[in-house]
């Protein structure tokens, strides 16, 4: 797998504003937290972006990224209640049956 890169300034802002970091996302991916890779819903505005769906600390985050020739560039981290419901709570209900 290609390495991940990101903007240090954006990473610092995410830590302050949302309490999450790109390092945490990469650790979660490395420990099996990658749940899905989606096409960006607005391909016209973001033609080369896709979205990583990552589980970390019992929550799901959407991480838009651009695949470069030698690395993946992570753009931001979006906490998602809807993705948490769809990816984690649905699997918890399945496990109870």
How would you label these PLM feature ranges?
Residues 1-97:
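Ribonuclease/tRNase effector modules and their secretory precursors
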